[in-house]
Amino acid sequence: VNDEMLRQELSLGHVDGGGAHLLDLLNSPSLNINGMSSGQTGAHATNVIPSTATADLDLRLVVGIDWQKQQDRVVDYIRSQGYFVVETPPSREILLQHAKVALVKKDTAGYNAARTPMDLPIAEEVLTAVQAARGTVIEWPTMGGSVPLNAMEQAAQTRTITVPIANHDDNQHAANENLRLQNLWDGIETMASLLYMR
């Protein structure tokens, strides 16, 4: 991965990570702010001072970090900033007793990260099948994403391997998400090769 090329492509004047490469950062947990809201803006703006603000957080994990404990760490951090944390809408009494109150709704359906070593026989077989369809390929040992692979591994008592086919600039989950047609055709050939894997 060429970090500078990606930074230019995304028009980013600064990136987090203290100078570490993206591949190294993918092996670290992260906290994303997926959205924030409070009051209105633009044509809907008023002179009302909003009484609340809402943020939606996304915790990205790596192997070895429990998803429930990570949520607890976030709550502990919020408390360390002087907030009284509640799990249900606060009563008037609580609001009167505390200068800063945070309502935190923890996710009840999270899951841990999974990682399959690339030197396992099944991983080598998958790589051989993909190479048979595509020729030389990029081996990507770690890939971020919210896929419940750990839950699948627990249920099936086996390891999981993902074989992505999307273009790197597909704008996944965005309004303009896209898939290049060549990636689709190449993906069909790749999946066919995997289906015929011995």
Whereabouts are the PLM-identified features?
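An extended, acidic, His-containing surface patch that forms the Zn2+-binding/catalytic region
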Residues: 1-52, 60, 65-73, 81, ...
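Active-site helix-to-loop segments that bind/position phosphate- or nucleotide-bearing substrates
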Residues: 57
